[in-house]
């Protein structure tokens, strides 16, 4: 995946939504790619106990959304911005219930890394191999009724952790991009 966009980015209207940015941190461990996720603490305002990417609300001091994602990652798990190689900005997403407009950035981080987790925000770190998100047997799709409307929800189960909501949608989108890039490479060979 390169920083150059080979597909049109989908941006969402932000009216009435809180703008936030997240980092999708990818690292190599034991010869396989992994993604760093966090388990939110019970002390945060939104998404308590859920599995998410490091990230948060755009701050007035943030020059841009990428800086927001890197700042929040530093605050939550202690990864220095200089240690992240940002590869791409993905499509915008939103959270259904809490009304966040989320802009994800994919970045490579070194491994091993000495994380400094903020206990007020983060209860723990989860680092599933990226491969599980390519395996249809590891995912399920449910239809939830939200405000009287059906909403499709993809979720992944890994080592007892339920990865769902915007986090699962972002991971599913990342997998689709990687698969389409691999398919494009096969066609060009």
Predicted regions and their residues:
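N-terminal leader/linker segments that precede catalytic domains of diphosphate-processing enzymes
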Residues: 1-52, 57-112, 143-189
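NUDIX/MutT-family hydrolases
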Residues: 117-159
């Amino acid at each position: 995946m390169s920083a150059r966009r080979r597909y049109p980015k989908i941006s969402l209207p932000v009216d009435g939504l809180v703008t936030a940015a997240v980092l999708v941190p990818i690292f190599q461990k034991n010869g396989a790619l992994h993604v760093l996720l966090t388990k939110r603490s019970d002390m945060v305002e939104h998404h308590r106990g859920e599995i998410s990417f490091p990230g948060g609300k755009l701050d007035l001091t943030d020059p841009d959304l990428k800086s927001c994602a890197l700042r929040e990652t530093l605050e939550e798990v202690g990864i220095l911005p200089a240690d992240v190689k940002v590869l791409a900005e993905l499509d915008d997403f939103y959270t259904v219930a809490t009304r966040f407009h989320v802009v994800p950035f994919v970045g490579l981080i070194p491994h091993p890394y000495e994380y400094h987790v903020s206990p007020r925000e983060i209860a723990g770190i989860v680092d599933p191999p990226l491969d599980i998100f390519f395996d249809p047997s590891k995912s399920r799709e449910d239809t939830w009724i939200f405000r009287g409307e059906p909403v499709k929800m993809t979720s992944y189960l890994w080592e007892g952790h339920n990865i769902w909501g915007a986090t699962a949608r972002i991971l599913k989108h990342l997998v689709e991009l990687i698969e389409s890039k691999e398919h494009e490479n096969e066609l060009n060979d």
